[in-house]
Amino acid sequence: VVFRGIPVVAAVFLPWRDSGSIIHARIDNGTFENDRRLKLVGGESPQRGRLSGLPSYYWAMFGFRNGLRRQIGEIRSLGSVVYELALTARGSMQISLFYSPKIWDVAAGVLLVKEAGGDVRVRTQKTHGWEPFLSFGSRTTTLQELYDWRGTILAGDQNITQYVSRRLIYRRRLLFRLRRWLQDKR
């Protein structure tokens, strides 16, 4: 649920183990897996043996500085943005990176990660830098503006997202810009 541009309640069903698991959060009340409170704890930088959620085309979209490519970990793209964010909130993935998801793909996951003590960053269009995610719009954002929202999202433990965001280079590729423009025209 998004209220005035801010995710306030989230729940995601993870269809695994015997009967599955529900990861849920409410703003200012933490993230829980069923009844167990989740708390993200990471290191200073990504670890090679841990999972990281990146889009399958990450190598064409992003460059890596200062050895980040060797540190980024075991890369996975599971096909569900909210599922990857839920796994990030529970600590199964150390980071998740998404190029241009829609609000309905990330709203629940953003709250899950933040309420688990994690950090969510969004890449700005003006400076192409990374800023902490605050909301999907202002208090007066219209439904159409929410529908049209798209942003590059990086989520995980605060130390790790800061480390990665300082070493991640966005490659402006004409083909990707053309595809996005065509998608937006549909």
How would you name each of these model-derived features?
Residues 13, 25-26, 37-44, 165-166:
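Short amphipathic beta-strand/extended segments with alternating polar/hydrophobic composition
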Residues 29-34:
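Short polybasic amphipathic segments
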Residues 69, 86-186:
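Oxyanion/phosphate-interacting regions
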Residues 24, 42-48, 144-147:
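Solvent-exposed alpha-helices and their adjacent loops that cap or buttress functional pockets
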Residues 8, 48-49, 149-153:
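Short, surface-exposed beta-edge/turn micro-motifs
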Residues 1-28:
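DPxDG-like acidic metal-binding loop motif
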Residues 38-114:
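Phosphate/pyrophosphate- and phosphate-bearing ligand-binding catalytic cores of soluble enzymes
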Residues 15-17, 56-58, 156-159:
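Short, flexible beta-strand-to-coil junctions
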